[in-house]
Swiss-Prot record:
Family: Belongs to the protein kinase superfamily. Tyr protein kinase family. SYK/ZAP-70 subfamily.
Region (Interdomain A): 103-162
Gene: ZAP70
Protein's name according to its UniProt entry: Tyrosine-protein kinase ZAP-70
PTM comment: Phosphorylated on tyrosine residues upon T-cell antigen receptor (TCR) stimulation. Phosphorylation of Tyr-315 and Tyr-319 are essential for ZAP70 positive function on T-lymphocyte activation whereas Tyr-292 has a negative regulatory role. Within the C-terminal kinase domain, Tyr-492 and Tyr-493 are phosphorylated after TCR induction, Tyr-492 playing a negative regulatory role and Tyr-493 a positive. Tyr-493 is dephosphorylated by PTN22.
Record EC number: 2.7.10.2
SMART domains hit by this protein: SH2 (SM00252), TyrKc (SM00219)
Taxonomic placement: Eukaryota, Metazoa, Chordata, Craniata, Vertebrata
Segments for region (Disordered): 260-309
Phenotype for A141E: Increased constitutive kinase activity
Domain notes: Composed of 2 N-terminal SH2 domains and a C-terminal kinase domain. The tandem SH2 domains bind to the doubly phosphorylated tyrosine-based activation motif (ITAM) of CD247/CD3Z and the non-canonical phosphorylated tyrosine-based activation motif (TAM) of RHOH. The interdomain B located between the second SH2 and the kinase domain contains 3 tyrosines (Tyr-292, Tyr-315, Tyr-319) that are phosphorylated following TCR activation. These sites have been implicated in binding to other signaling molecules including CBL or VAV1.
Amino acid sequence: MPDPAAHLPFFYGSISRAEAEEHLKLAGMADGLFLLRQCLRSLGGYVLSLVHDVRFHHFPIERQLNGTYAIAGGKAHCGPAELCEFYSRDPDGLPCNLRKPCNRPSGLEPQPGVFDCLRDAMVRDYVRQTWKLEGEALEQAIISQAPQVEKLIATTAHERMPWYHSSLTREEAERKLYSGAQTDGKFLLRPRKEQGTYALSLIYGKTVYHYLISQDKAGKYCIPEGTKFDTLWQLVEYLKLKADGLIYCLKEACPNSSASNASGAAAPTLPAHPSTLTHPQRRIDTLNSDGYTPEPARITSPDKPRPMPMDTSVYESPYSDPEELKDKKLFLKRDNLLIADIELGCGNFGSVRQGVYRMRKKQIDVAIKVLKQGTEKADTEEMMREAQIMHQLDNPYIVRLIGVCQAEALMLVMEMAGGGPLHKFLVGKREEIPVSNVAELLHQVSMGMKYLEEKNFVHRDLAARNVLLVNRHYAKISDFGLSKALGADDSYYTARSAGKWPLKWYAPECINFRKFSSRSDVWSYGVTMWEALSYGQKPYKKMKGPEVMAFIEQGKRMECPPECPPELYALMSDCWIYKWEDRPDFLTVEQRMRACYYSLASKVEGPPGSTQKAEAACA
């Protein structure tokens, strides 16, 4: 997941205060000259380095608990770019407003931080180990949940560092530091037997010094009376630049031979999944024989952890178990199906009922589409076509068909997605559901549609009503009644005649020439985006089909929904390009939607936090 400031030309990444000042000197030291850099103290925070009266000023920008960004005592902003734009108009307590960005020289990329270099491998390890996923299921999980997983693993990144020794006594630490070259500044970090505390051991002048590192009630790490940090690795990086109470700066790591490094492979202890985390407490009964606890405590929020798609029973196919796969057939035995007296929905075809399907090793909740008695033969054939199509599809973001049961009626047995359709879920929840959550769900839909595109399927009925929720953070595409499988060499399907089509979701070529392709699904995706970002409003409100067609032919498009981020409306507009061949494909749509979602996930909306303004010394 890229840094939210990575696209800013005046963002330098993980550079020191001295390096920032050198860049500002080279740029001329004009009043209002500024740059942005990563903050070593605050996870996800920044430092604004500013010139005024030929002096340097450094202001830490902290990421608030609600995901906004603020200089201490100042207004909160949804992202670093928005914060800098605000201070370019109003100094609001700074010595002067931001007047001239000190842009990076041509060819110079932002300097990656320590965690940046480890993040991708740690995310992959965490997802693989926590949910036991492999292959495509693993890749889909990494893409869809990277913002959430990154927040979990940042606190354990120190376990991948060469200077971290997970089980070392004070005496053993001294022996290690005295062995070999006794270079001033040689150091290591180890856990102490008191839960949640650590010791930093440092050699200087042939003597080893030990410094206590503890956590405060907010979970921040510090040496007593020293600067506080969100993580241990940030504290170490800071102390490499500034002694800050130590006898000497940290210079050279005393390596742990079993730690993961550039050439090693030992994995860190990954954080427990949020649902298993507890508040820290001193576990005297779990001390090892040498007095050390096996795993440092982690301070966590008392709030209920947010669910991830991988936590649900419908992320992987019920047939992902090789034993269950042996019984996979299109037609199911009625004896294995229990139909509850609970109706989930109804329509012209019949009803959808809740049920349970008994498999070889487990029972699963299912939704059962029951065709009503006396149904026309054509409707029965259409339902069987839908079943044939759905049975071929296997993706976490598509409702899977378990099978068909022919008994008292024709029944399609599908995965349960009990949260209901997306548009109904969002109605009236603008204040409750942030745009970042909506973008998360839309990104999942784009992943499902990219899968269909790769499989050469055209959905033909993509709309918010056909996006079902498993929970607030997990969406699946449903209703494949109009879907078609294209031939290997075909790029579109031509319908023989027009039916009861959802014209407000259809691209011009569908209405005018009955031509359907993955690019016409892209048009429908744009309308689905509009529905979701309008929080369940109806598209083309009060217009009828012919009026919608005329509206589109005149080059008009629906307006940007209120408070919809411009980058999302830009994607929406590209989905509505008139010529189908000029529209993006779902590969491109998913990539752009992913970038929007990641950006919004890193700057969650919320009420401004309140802090006290003060210029602070920071690295």
